[in-house]
Amino acid sequence: MAGILIIAHTPIASAMLSFAEHVYGSIPEHIQAVDIPAHEDAKISFERVLTAAKAVERHGELLVLTDVMGATPANVASRLMTQQNSSGVKLKVQILAGLNLPMLMRAVSYKDDALDVLAQKTLQGGQNGILRLGAMANVQTTEVQD
């Protein structure tokens, strides 16, 4: 059981959380979003992210979903890997970049799984959610013609 933190460029993180609330009705307190404005100082961004991480982590575990690898939100998120929770326990953090809606839906659906399992299922959900629709139409057409 891990907390889930969405860290992305403004307004992506909060928009993703709003989408999850729309789909699931309500979202547990251990799932939050932090938007990173374009010109915010990285130190300020990190302090906001750290505060949110400490609020949502469960049993010292945290899954972070971020939008773009190498961008400020992902870089800020990576600094969480060396942090401790409020009890002084080193956080166990898994960070996934490339956030998409299927990834988020998978994370929310499996929110009570162990961190490693949650991260793997979430990653698979994000990858499986990327499709080329024309290719799918061809497959469906072929199946119908048989």
Report residues per predicted region.
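N-terminal loops that bind phosphate or other acidic moieties
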Residues: 2-146
